[in-house]
């Protein structure tokens, strides 16, 4: 079985990677990315790609809709809102650090900051806000930081992802770095992000159905039942995009880069841009 899967992945790479190896603009990449998934799943409306595997599998969708009747993230989301609104020791709140008071801004993240040449993520700016106001950073990836980000993202639900790649060679460099990471094979299993979520989206690996990459980050931060089972408390199931990236690297037995590393920021920049136009639906519930 493992040999068969390996041969399939190799064949898929040889057959499908050639167009991606050519020099293209981000906008050309975006159009090709969208078209690939819309051609592959013609019965799935564009907006419904926000729902991952639940947009392409009726049985799993029914299970998910049942979960959403009593969402497991509800208490944690309330905690995230309380933390967001709670004043720092100096009397300021998170709202003082963000445009529009931090409400309905998730669709613009991550973004390229021309002043620093860096990619700014929502979670990174939450901790920057804390430091600016004399507070210690929160642990990246999970816990209170993920809950605060999930609450902020939830205020953008229904707004469409709108990540901008400005006319700046530094921004394009970040984008291309993320694109390269997405299609590069890694780890002992010699697999890429694209192997699972582009070429073989919709296929099963053991009991897991591989979700399409289109709309992939529209529901982050996410609440995963798997994380919930490993931890305790109302925030155990929450995790950020970079926590999930690390988990993917572990699954292919590759070394992770760590939350807020340049590699993961570039990947988030690329992958979110590829889902531009998809409505936000956060936090999502996933297995």
Language-model regions, residue ranges each:
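Bacterial Sec-dependent signal peptides at the C-terminal "C-region" and cleavage site
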Residues: 16-24
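An amphipathic alpha-helix/helix-turn recognition signal
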Residues: 75-76, 173
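Bacterial N-terminal signal peptides that target proteins for export
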Residues: 1-9
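Electron-transfer interface patches adjacent to heme c in soluble/periplasmic c-type cytochromes
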Residues: 23-74, 86-147, 154-158, 164, ...
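N-terminal carbohydrate-binding/catalytic regions of secreted carbohydrate-active enzymes
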Residues: 77-79, 83-85
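Solvent-exposed, charged amphipathic helical/linker segments at domain boundaries
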Residues: 159-177
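Bacterial N-terminal signal peptides
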Residues: 8-17
């Amino acid at each position: 079985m493992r040999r068969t899967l390996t041969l399939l992945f190799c064949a898929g790479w040889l057959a499908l990677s050639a167009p991606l190896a050519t020099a293209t603009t981000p906008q050309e990449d975006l159009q090709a990315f969208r078209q690939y998934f819309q051609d592959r799943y013609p019965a799935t409306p564009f907006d419904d790609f926000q729902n991952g595997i639940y947009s392409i599998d009726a049985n799993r969708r029914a299970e998910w809709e049942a979960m959403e009747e009593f969402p497991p993230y509800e208490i944690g989301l309330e905690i995230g809102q309380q933390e967001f609104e709670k004043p720092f020791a100096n009397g300021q709140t998170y709202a003082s650090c963000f445009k529009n008071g931090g409400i309905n801004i998730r669709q613009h993240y991550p973004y390229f900051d021309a002043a620093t040449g860096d990619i700014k993520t929502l979670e990174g700016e939450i901790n920057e806000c804390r430091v600016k106001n004399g507070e210690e950073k929160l642990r990246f990836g999970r816990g209170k930081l993920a809950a605060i980000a999930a609450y902020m993202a939830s205020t953008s639900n229904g707004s469409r992802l709108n990540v901008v790649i400005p006319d700046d060679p530094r921004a394009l460099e970040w984008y291309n770095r993320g694109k390269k990471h997405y299609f590069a094979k890694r780890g002992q299993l010699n697999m890429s992000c694209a192997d699972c979520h582009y070429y073989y989206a919709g296929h099963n690996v053991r009991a897991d159905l591989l979700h399409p990459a289109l709309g992939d980050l529209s529901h982050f931060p996410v609440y995963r039942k798997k994380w919930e089972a490993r931890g305790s408390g109302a925030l155990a199931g929450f995790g950020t995009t970079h926590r999930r990236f690390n988990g993917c690297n572990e699954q292919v037995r590759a070394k992770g880069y760590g939350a807020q590393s340049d590699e993961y920021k570039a990947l988030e920049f690329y992958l979110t841009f590829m889902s531009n136009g998809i409505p936000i639906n956060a936090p999502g519930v996933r297995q």
